[in-house]
UniProtKB/Swiss-Prot annotation:
One Pfam entry name: Pur_DNA_glyco
Source species of the chain: Carboxydothermus hydrogenoformans (strain ATCC BAA-161 / DSM 6008 / Z-2901)
Top-level EC class: hydrolase
Alphabetized Gene3D superfamilies for the sequence: Methylpurine-DNA glycosylase (MPG)
Enzyme Commission identifier(s): 3.2.2.-
GO biological process, one term: base-excision repair
Keyword Hydrolase: yes
Molecular function, one GO term: alkylbase DNA N-glycosylase activity
The keyword 4Fe-4S is assigned to this record: no
Protein name: Putative 3-methyladenine DNA glycosylase
Family: Belongs to the DNA glycosylase MPG family.
Amino acid sequence: MLLPRQFYARDVLIVAKDLLNCYLVREYNGHLLIGKIVETEAYHQNDPACHAYRGKTKRNEVMFGPPGHAYVYFTYGMHYCFNVVTGAIGRAEAVLIRALEPVKGIDIIKTLRGGKSERELLSGPAKLTQGLAIDLKLNGHDLTGGKILYITKGEPVAEEDIVVTTRIGINAGKDLPYRFYLKNNKYVSKK
């Protein structure tokens, strides 16, 4: 079942947890590339690590709503990262999808990733965007439309099966417990 806009129109910390075990689906050249979401990070406008911390810009304007849209950005001059916009319109919030467990289209994902091992295919933000062919053309894409790029419902996850920890690869706000991942999942980027 496709996740509706109401799913995303909630607090970023709730959505970040609830996205775990859901499926990110990418329609690519007539094929479905699917990964189960196993790791997320939450960002909101009052968070110094958030792209919207200093206000709205051309780069981050998608974060200000409406919820349920893709926020894709280019980083380090070589990688894309994929986020899901959450919360109310006008309040910048997004969930970074950090890692996926490959489910379908694995051979195509391997080709897009240059033949990496299955464990390494989608186990990081830049890896998953490369493996699912997500780039700036999908920035602002409506994830509730059910075409090209969208998220479908997964099985709920028990609280005891979710690890809550600090985020990775940031300097500001690094002490905030805004990273969530499925316990004992081998596709998580880092434990």
